[in-house]
Amino acid sequence: MSTEMIVVPASHADVGDIVSLVNSAYRGEGAGWTNEVGLLAGPRTDPATLAEVLAAEKGTMLLMREKDGAQLAGCVALEPAGEAATWHLAMLTVDPRRQAEGLGRALLSKAEDYVRRQGAARVQMTVISLRHSLIAWYERRGYRRTGASEPFPYGDDRVGVPLRDDLHFVVLEKPCRWGRRDGPARLRAKSLQIE
């Protein structure tokens, strides 16, 4: 029996569920294979910050849910960046109990499809430089380090409490193009169907 998943735009009614999902995946006890435990403490996001994301004139947050709409399995935020035809991807999250099912890969593919349809030439993201396994995961999906880095926003409570003084972000980028390798994901996960 398979669990069908759908990807839909988030609404303000979803804020509470998204906050719980993101905080459990990034900082929760028993968090999944990749998290920020040991790097940052406190919540990863809060209702006010997510409400701002959803109220933004441009961009979107996509949610991955079971088809019946009951269970939120993942989310990702997307917004146009300052450069023409560049979109920023952030907060890619999968419920820690559902990781290793191919959901993150599928949601990333849907996010890339979305920005392609918006005319994006590239997708960029920032990742904490010490999250080596996460950076490697993105690199296996075609993202490359640009060589640029950005300072960590020490003192900004919206991102949590830093536990180290050597945090900074690396910038990853992937060109947006349709093709056999970069087109919509053909998932091999046993129990996953994406509409």
Predicted feature residues:
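Short, conserved glycine- and acidic-residue-centered signature motifs
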Residues: 82, 104, 165
